[in-house]
UniProtKB/Swiss-Prot annotation:
Residues 64-146 form the SCAN box domain. This is Zinc finger protein 394. It comes from Homo sapiens (Human). Pfam families: KRAB, SCAN, zf-C2H2. May be involved in transcriptional regulation. The gene is ZNF394. GO terms for biological process: regulation of transcription by RNA polymerase II. Signal peptide: none annotated. It comes from the Eukaryota. Its main location: nucleus.
């Protein structure tokens, strides 16, 4: 019976796909899938269903689920089946947006999550990794939280169990419930009291005090509660069981009892709400940190490291949504040798926040997410995949393209609350708001000009003659960093600014603007003496010398007379 149940679970999990297993209870009956999968199930025929595709383009994850769940019976023929699969796969992998390497990473990540043991899958998917390296970091962090080592090739579940909620027990078919009872009686002699099981069938919330009282005649069940074991366990592994992290074999469902686990001092330690007094605030923190999953890891203190009865145990009990789960904090050693309790859940999240597994091979800068690394690498490669359809200008980031498009649309979403003036970019608004705060303005002692503190040091370089930005190629120095970037294009030959009319390219935007006046005929520079107009300021300056020479010639002639 054990092998048949395991084979049945493997077959159903393989059909549903790896990501669906994280959203549903792993041991729910097939008739309960309709509440967890994005499909439409007919009541009279549980085996037949039609995908409920939205009218608008679904997100990639929804398309991936539809791609994995499509059945040949749902389509009219082989041509439609092949066409539907191609469409769903394209919506999922988005080849028009993602590179080949990114698409390959998505496929590898999906397969990596598939081969993980089910207990690790629930934890890894809770953190929603975006790449294989991020999933590996989650597994490593969990491994360190469980046994304090990161180099071992095995994950030990000797002190770990996954709790089963009352609703999940209620949804189990009779065959699986019988299997639970048989496994429990075989391994530890524990039995479920008939009164307790009937209360579960009636969907009633059972106080912890009453559970212990009803289970007291059996003895072993009360011992299980005192040993901080969950009432029902999906893990099902004994204290000697070790599961290789590469093996994805599901473990049989059974009741678990541990006579070696240390219990509470008395039943009176549990209050009326089924929780240990003084631990309510800690329970709320732990419940929020595990918001994405009902699969809660229960760690038990090893026998050699257990505190005495007079010491504070640090046990937690949580009873919510018809679920009773025990959490015992694992002791750790500080640098000074003092023992303390620390939640492995919080420790794992702290490690994940500190780690930056994605490192740039060019400059060594590290990032938390792979997508941030991809965006950063465009600085080195010069890739600019986002192009403006109006003028053809390209950008390395979509946010920069959005800002640029406002120059064509005239949109100014940022408004000053003091004067009502609107701006296209947030940086322009911040610069403008500094004009309202006079206390942040300073006066230059050299020329008397008043400017903001952020521009004061830049302004003072004009008087001091400082040029802190130096080119490594020709050793030419500049006052501003932006001028150095523009100068670098002379050595690299980069010409990012192209004319949309003739295709000619330039290394500076100002040069492109001057060139475009040839096509538009614009002449913005006007001579105040004769009214003649010019395209460039240099042409106007050259023209003004003609008037200056005439004035000088007239002055010389008058002096002779």
């Amino acid at each position: 019976m054990n092998s048949s149940l395991t084979a049945q679970r493997r077959g159903s999990d393989a059909e549903l796909g790896p990501w669906v297993m994280a959203a549903r209870s792993k041991d729910a009956a097939p008739s309960q899938r309709d509440g967890l999968l994005p499909v439409k199930v007919e009541e009279d025929s549980p085996g037949s269903w039609e995908p409920n595709y939205p009218a608008a383009s679904p997100d990639p994850e929804t398309s991936r689920l539809h791609f994995r769940q499509l059945r040949y019976q749902e389509v009219a023929g082989p041509e439609e089946a092949l066409s539907r699969l191609r469409e769903l796969c394209r919506r999922w992998l988005r080849p028009e947006l993602l590179s080949k390497e990114q698409i390959l990473e998505l496929l590898v990540l999906e397969q990596f999550l598939t081969i993980l043991p089910e207990e690790l899958q629930a934890w890894v998917r809770e953190h929603c990794p975006e790449s294989g390296e991020e999933a590996v970091a989650v597994v490593r962090a969990l491994q360190r939280a469980l046994d304090g080592t990161s180099s071992q090739g095995m994950v030990t579940f000797e002190d770990t169990a996954v709790s089963l909620t009352w609703e999940e027990w209620e949804r189990l078919d009779p065959a699986r419930r019988d299997f639970c009872r048989e496994s429990a009686q075989k391994d530890s002699g524990s039995t479920v009291p008939p009164s307790l099981e009937s209360r579960v069938e009636n969907k009633e919330l059972i106080p912890m005090q009453q559970i212990l009282e009803e289970a007291e005649p059996q003895g072993q069940l009360q011992e299980a509660f005192q040993g901080k074991r969950p009432l029902f366990s999906k893990c099902g592994s004994t204290h000697e069981d070790r599961v290789e992290k590469q093996s994805g074999d599901p473990l049989p469902l059974k009741l678990e009892n541990s006579p070696e686990a240390e219990g509470l001092n008395s039943i009176s330690d549990v209050n009326k709400n089924g929780s240990i007094e003084g631990e309510d605030s800690k329970n709320n923190e732990l419940q929020n940190s595990a918001r994405c999953s009902n699969l809660v890891l229960c760690q038990h203190i090893p026998k050699a490291e257990r505190p005495t009865d007079s010491e504070e145990h640090g046990n937690k009990c949580k009873q919510s949504f018809h679920m009773v789960t025990w959490h015992v904090l694992k002791p750790h050693k500080s640098d000074s040798g003092d023992s303390f309790h620390h939640s492995s859940l919080f420790e794992t999240q702290r490690q994940l926040h500190e780690e930056r597994p994605y490192k740039c091979g060019n400059c060594g800068k590290s990032f938390k997410q792979r997508s941030d690394l991809f965006r950063h690498q465009r600085i080195h490669t010069g890739e600019k995949p986002y192009g403006c359809q109006e003028c053809g200008k390209s950008f390395s980031q979509s946010a920069a393209l959005t800002k640029h498009q406002r120059t064509h649309t005239g949109e100014k979403p940022y408004t000053c609350l003091k004067c009502g003036e609107r701006f296209r970019q947030n940086s322009h608004l911040n610069r403008h708001q500094s004009t309202h705060s006079r206390d942040k303005h300073f006066k230059c002692e050299e020329c008397g000009e008043t400017c903001h503190i952020s521009n004061l040091f830049r302004h003072q370089r004009l008087h001091k003659g400082e040029r802190p930005y130096k080119c490594e190629e020709c050793e030419k120095s500049f006052k501003q960093r932006s001028d150095l970037f523009k100068h670098h294009r002379i050595h690299t030959g980069e010409k990012p600014y192209g004319c949309s009319v003739c295709g000619k390219r330039f290394n500076q935007s100002a040069t492109l603007i001057k060139h475009q006046r040839i096509h538009t005929g614009e002449k913005p520079y006007k001579c105040l003496e004769c009214g003649e107009r010019f395209r460039q300021s240099t042409h106007l300056i050259r023209h003004q010398r003609i008037h200056q020479n005439k004035v000088l010639s007239a002055g010389r002639g008058g002096s002779r007379l």
